Amino acid sequence: MNIKLITVGKLKEHYLKDGIAEYSKRIARFAKVELIEVPDEKTPEHASQAQNQQIMAKEGERIADKIGSRDYVIVLAIEGKQLPSETFSKKMSDITLSGYSTITFIIGGSLGLDERIKQRADMAISFGLLTLPHQLMRLVLIEQIYRAFMIQQGSPYHK
């Protein structure tokens, strides 16, 4: 199984990099992890809605280039479905049993995701209505992916 995490922008915070590296290492027992950062677009301070749409479209093109034609794609979006960790774990298991070898997770930039990427997605999930930095969501997501594997193993990690 392959887990691909496509994100917008370069992660600069060392504490987040360290956490992501740790969980990636833990997940490596179960799946190959590929972390892909696509460049973000500079957003003018008082950007119009049209400018924001153009920025998301450019970032969306870069994301689309990294999605495999046979990937199962899950986007993080505020309007996505909120799942308990156990349900998320079962969903990941069901996806692999359905014949997919790669699950691709996508986290957009500070403006969100282009609609075309959302439409390409097989599933949209949300971690709630709170607004969180997209850089922090990388760590939260990768921890939940690790937790999903631990649930599948019956590990006491998930209590």
Swiss-Prot record:
**Role of this protein:** Specifically methylates the pseudouridine at position 1915 (m3Psi1915) in 23S rRNA.
Fetch the InterPro entries from UniProt: Alpha/beta_knot_MTases (IPR029028), RlmH-like (IPR003742), tRNA_m1G_MTases_N (IPR029026)
Where is it predominantly found? cytoplasm
> What catalytic activity is recorded?
pseudouridine(1915) in 23S rRNA + S-adenosyl-L-methionine = N(3)-methylpseudouridine(1915) in 23S rRNA + S-adenosyl-L-homocysteine + H(+)
Keyword Acyltransferase applies: no
This chain's source organism reads: Leuconostoc citreum (strain KM20)
**An annotated Gene Ontology molecular function:** rRNA (pseudouridine-N3-)-methyltransferase activity
Q: What is its EC number?
A: 2.1.1.177
Record-stated family: Belongs to the RNA methyltransferase RlmH family.
Q: Which residues bind S-adenosyl-L-methionine?
A: L76, G108, F127, G128, L129, L130, T131, L132
Q: Which UniProt keywords apply?
A: Cytoplasm, Methyltransferase, rRNA processing, S-adenosyl-L-methionine, Transferase
Q: What is the lineage of its organism?
A: Bacteria, Bacillati, Bacillota, Bacilli, Lactobacillales
Q: This chain belongs to which protein, by name? A: Ribosomal RNA large subunit methyltransferase H
Q: How does it assemble?
A: Homodimer.
Compartment annotation: Cytoplasm
**Cellular component GO terms held in the UniProt record:** cytoplasm
Under Pfam families, the record lists: SPOUT_MTase
